[in-house]
Amino acid sequence: MTNRLIATKTHVLNQLCGFLREREMLPAIAFVFSRKQVELYASSITVPVLEFDSKVAYTVKYECEQIIRKLPNYLEYLQLPEYIKLVELLEKGIGIHHSGMIPILREIVELMISKKYIKILFATESFAIGLDCPIKTAIFTSLTKFDGHNERYLMSHEYTQMAGRAGRRGIDTIGHVVHCNNLFKPLSSLDYKTILNGIPQKLVSKFRISYSLMLNLLKNGQTTDFHLFIEKSMVHNEIQNAIKGLIHEKTELTEEISKKMKFIEVAETPRTICDELLSLNEIIPNCVNKRRKKAEKDKQLLVYNYKNIINDAARVNELNNLKIKCQEIDNVTKNTISYIKSQTDTICDILLNSNIIKPLDDTTQSNSFELTTTGKFASNISELHPLIISRLVNEKWNNFADFSTKQMIGLFSCFTTIKVSDEYKLTIENIDDSYLCYRIKEIENMCIEYNDIEYNNSLDTGIDYDNMIQYDIVELSMKWCDCSNEMECKQFIQTDVSDMSISVGDFTKSMLKIVTIANEFINIYEQSENTDTLYKLSLIERMILKYIMTSQSLYV
């Protein structure tokens, strides 16, 4: 029996950092596909990564403080545990970067990278896009990632984007890429080859014929022929390519049908006899008693009289299947050619039935439309489902007349995209406010209604109705409004927010999203005389953007 030594992640990473430092392969970026692991890996580094004569360890704390002092509420940031922990890492030449960080702290890391103070950066893949930094080595702590549904291997273009960070243009002649194979399960040679040298990502349009698109066209003066505008988009080119592919496929099928026909014409068994056998094969499984016995007897008689009938009938069956497939391609081609027109017409019908648009001329069956009052309201909404919200606000909620500002905040929080682990997921039953709960259920019902409409009409508007509403921070956001001083805010973040495993950065983004939604409604109500609703909406920003929950930036 042999002893097998299993290296811990901490040991592997420390050995690697020492190796890179000795061979002057720093600065490096280590890609980690988990926010929690980013901070754990960074904290586990104990070997020195800074140069022997580096002054970073003594000066970085002062420089960070000087940067933070640009903010009016800098003292609140200086006392944050997240800030203190980050500075401790920076003093060792280590940085972290992920989307769950407080935006200001993330910007500090980016500034420190540009100053070359960070020798090893632990980051998620979001850092691979859009940020310039001096990196010699790219480290992969894993070659798999969770894509929101399943754990999967990196795609070739994702790997290339991250690995391409190694080596600075015009400075380095070579970039190093390190795979920590002893930190993850071994891959097959085929999987490795696919990741390193797979098929490049195809450029696919994410353009959708949506309600917002149609509303914007109407808002900007277009009243008819909406499909003509959409045909200028990239999706039109994709449709044309799909049509070419279908035509090519039909041509190949037609040639194959022609070849089959020639064989059948010279076959020993007449075509009508083959069809009779195929018909018997279809009805025998569904027949019983006397009818089944008669059908089987007829089949045996045909097989006895025509020696090659089995093979000849098989060819006829193949021919029939090819003709069916050819007809299916014709139908798909027809639908594809008229896709844009049929989609825009269907959306127009939905907008008409939802009282969002009306015909320009009531006396004729015109295909020209204009926005109704509810439609004008909907055309100014982009953060939420324009049809559902405009109909509810105008037809049922009397322009938020019975909502308090806190209830509005709770309502808007349903449309934030915060991610909470399954063990902390909440449902509508967790909402204490009965009035707000009732209103949210109205939104749910309309989501079901429009989801069914789109499904029945084969529409693809790009709206994910299953995940459109979430209830995880409804109570949190309303409770946040009650925090009136720094101590209460700090305690709320360290208890209520932390207890749900929500990062301060994610909670900040959610509060900013609520403010964005509120500002959208403010722009709408500024054009009307509804001062009561406008006043309630104007209170939202000051109620939730406080303490470190702000839109401040060090780059401005």
Please report, for each region that a protein language model flagged, where it lies by residue.
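Conserved C-terminal RecA-like helicase domain
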Residues: 1, 8, 13-17, 31, ...
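Conserved NTP-handling cores and scaffolds of large molecular machines
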Residues: 20, 45, 49, 53, ...
